[in-house]
Amino acid sequence: MKPPMQPLTQALPFSLRDALQGTGLRVPVIKMGTGWEGMYRTLKEVAYILLCCWCIKELLD
């Protein structure tokens, strides 16, 4: 019998892990905090994702 697999969210940075928790499809969900804090956190997560995508693109080129 196979050992139970750990969800993908444990391998991701904590901010993305927080965004992914609670979704059945395990897709990112933007969580807004209060005022500018939520916007700042969302912008940081978007910047992180874009940076990762750019790095992967550069590695594949």
UniProtKB/Swiss-Prot annotation:
A family per Pfam: LEP503
Disulfide pattern: none
Superkingdom assignment: Eukaryota
InterPro entries xrefs: LEP503
Tissue specificity field: Preferentially expressed in the lens epithelial cells.
Signal peptide region: none
Protein name (database record): Lens epithelial cell protein LEP503
Organism: Rattus norvegicus (Rat)
Gene: Lenep
